[in-house]
């Protein structure tokens, strides 16, 4: 049985991912600072650890040495109503960067077999996203960097962090840039 850890599993994407992986027969551990708003823990994971991933000791506790796959979805995100006002930029950048610094280091230390980092299309330059019918969101358009928000800058930084751990320490990392994810069990406020 695959051993999976989902960081940020109390959120929209993490809850759906946990449910799917449990249905596929995986053992799922979720860590988040909050409970899932819509699902009971037993519906999305075998183990739920409520903790603050900005704390390195919490990350050390959550990430086990026998982890087959780790999905890093955790961020100080709080929903679109939180990240795009500009009022929370310092917290978004500081807290999310701390989470990712802690996670990358601990994944290397514990020799996690595969790491998935959830980035965002917000890391693309703002001018690439102005035409909603034809966003220029391809790899060659990512630089020169000019993300549309501090959230986007932090996502870009953390992409570079995980890629550096992949390059320097052989941390098997995959990255996806999500764009406007919504659906059942989603929330505007996070």
Located regions from the model:
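N-terminal Rossmann/SDR dinucleotide-binding element
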Residues: 1-69
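SDR active-site strand-loop-helix element
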Residues: 7, 31, 70-76, 115-121, ...
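Rossmann-fold NAD(P)-dependent oxidoreductase module
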Residues: 16, 20, 106, 161
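NAD(P)H-binding glycine-rich loop region in Rossmannoid oxidoreductase-like domains
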Residues: 53-95, 106
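Glycine-rich NAD(P)-binding loop of the Rossmann-fold in SDR/ketoreductase-type enzymes
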Residues: 69, 91-102, 110, 149, ...
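Conserved Rossmann-fold NAD(P)-dependent oxidoreductase catalytic core, especially the SDR/UDP-sugar
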Residues: 101-148
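Flexible, glycine-rich beta-alpha linker
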Residues: 123-125, 149-150, 171-190
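Active-site Tyr-X1-5-Lys
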Residues: 126, 146-174
